[in-house]
Design a protein with these regions (language model features):
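Aromatic- and acid-rich polysaccharide-binding/catalytic face
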Residues: 114, 120, 157-181
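Fungal secretory targeting signals
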Residues: 1-20
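Aromatic-lined carbohydrate-recognition surfaces of secreted/lumenal glycan-active proteins
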Residues: 144-163
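Active-site groove signature of glycoside hydrolases
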Residues: 107-129, 156
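Loop/turn elements at helix/coil->beta-strand transitions in domains of secreted/extracellular proteins
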Residues: 51-56, 77-82, 109-115, 147-152, ...
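Active-site-adjacent beta->alpha loops and helix N-cap segments on the catalytic face
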Residues: 63-75, 124-140
């Protein structure tokens, strides 16, 4: 498929929230240990202290290091919103990610969710095929809709992934697409 058709398809996605300013934050400290809720809150408050007053972050996973179990209470206490990353590789890991997201929604509602990204750079790295990513996007969307969450669900990848016609199925499955530059 030609670039123009892919670009037109991507352009047809809704742009109601076309831009977020935030930081990607991992669940591990520099020494490899997992962040505690207090450490998440400290990180969120540091971001708010920047001249840009950053109040949104992106996580890479939900279950690793109890990411959401520790980050969501900190996000709520600091008024930080999260672009939730759900790891899409490895079915067992993906299922654990979904459960961690459901647990966080059950415990804290969904006001802290900006949107949900299923996978990150999977297409660029060729870690998963496009049909698998599309299926997992639809799976997560169905799961969160079943508990009343209306957050957009999509995928983040490099620009080269978005202009590759083989990945059209992912664009079609997504409420939004994100780009790592």
């Amino acid at each position: 498929m030609r670039f123009g058709i892919i670009a037109a398809l991507a352009a047809s996605l809704p742009f109601t929230t076309a831009y977020w300013k935030g930081f990607n934050i991992g669940a591990n400290n520099a020494d490899g240990s997992c962040k505690t809720t207090a450490q998440w809150a400290e990180a969120f408050n540091k971001l708010k202290g920047l001249p840009q007053y950053i109040t949104s972050v992106r996580t890479y996973a939900t279950s690793d290091c109890n990411t959401l179990a520790n980050a969501v209470p900190a996000a709520l206490s600091t008024k930080t919103q999260i672009l939730v990353g759900v790891w899409a590789e490895d079915l067992a890991h993906f299922e654990a990610e979904k459960q961690a997201l459901l647990d966080a929604i059950s415990a804290h509602g969904s006001d802290w969710i900006i949107a949900i990204t299923v996978g990150s750079e999977d297409l660029y790295r060729k870690d998963s095929d496009p049909n698998t990513i599309a299926t997992r996007i639809n799976d997560v969307r169905g799961m969160v809709r079943s508990v009343g969450v209306q957050a957009s669900v999509g995928h983040v990848d490099t620009w080269t992934a978005w202009v590759d016609g083989a990945n059209e199925v992912v664009i079609k499955a997504s409420d939004f697409i994100g780009m790592d530059g």
